[in-house]
A protein has these predicted regions:
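Hydrophobic residues in beta-strands and at strand termini
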Residues: 65-67, 85, 109, 119, ...
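Glycine- and acidic-residue-biased ligand/ion/polar-headgroup-sensing regions
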Residues: 67, 77-95, 189
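Ligand-binding loop in jelly-roll beta-barrel domains
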Residues: 44, 54-56, 97-98, 111-136
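Double-stranded beta-helix
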Residues: 1-3, 120-162
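Short acidic-glycine-tyrosine-enriched beta hairpin
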Residues: 82, 95-112
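A short glycine-rich, His/Asp/Glu-containing loop-to-beta-strand
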Residues: 33-73, 152-189
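Transition-metal
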Residues: 1-44, 56, 60
Length: 189
């Protein structure tokens, strides 16, 4: 992988520990992550983690942004998008808001409202996009925040699992998805 400098194949030509069971699950070995060319990403190394071609109903990417790297529009007609800053900082905007995001920062952009970004230095991002499924009379809206500002809450009453919800989907049916981080006690699952 270009990320960990483990180049070549383990035992045989095209050998990998990654598993893709189309429409069921995907396990990607870090050694097998590759750079992809994805339109709109400039001065970025993009790894496709999931896509409709793999059987998913979404596309998600791990993006390593180099200094001055940018994207000219994440989303599309009917597509909702989410961007999370794993490391670094960048400027983001959509039709509704602009923000400076640092590590832990995120932006959710509703359908047909593209996200653009530009990095000041190196940054690592998680990007997710999918077709929005509307409920009559309800709609989603832009959400900007930072995981570092959210409290950990007990997940569904469990004593060993905690959640940080990024979107208000638990009480706003205009959101057809959620993004969150789960944290488990050691040995719990």
């Amino acid at each position: 992988s270009y990320l960990n400098n483990q180049l070549g194949y383990r035992d045989a030509l095209l050998d990998t520990r990654s598993i893709i069971k189309k429409g069921d699950y995907i396990v990607l070995d870090p050694d097998g992550l590759v750079k992809n060319v994805v339109p709109g990403y400039e001065n970025c190394d993009v790894t496709i983690l999931g896509s409709p071609a793999m059987g998913a109903t979404f596309a998600d990417y791990l993006v390593h942004v180099h200094e001055g790297g940018k994207n000219t529009g994440i989303g599309g007609e009917g597509i909702e998008s989410f961007l999370y800053v794993v490391d670094g900082e960048l400027s983001v905007k959509n039709d509704d808001q602009s923000a400076e995001l640092t590590k832990g920062g995120y932006i959710y952009s509703p359908a047909s409202n593209n996200i653009t970004f530009e990095a000041k230095g190196e940054a690592t991002l998680y990007v997710y996009r999918r077709r929005y499924e509307p409920v009559a009379g309800h709609s989603a809206h832009t959400v900007v925040g930072n995981a570092n500002d959210l409290e950990w809450m007990s997940y569904e009453g469990m004593e060993n699992c905690y959640v940080q919800d990024f979107l208000p989907s638990a009480h706003d049916i205009g959101f057809d998805m959620n993004m969150h981080i789960l944290k488990f006690h050691i040995g719990a699952s």
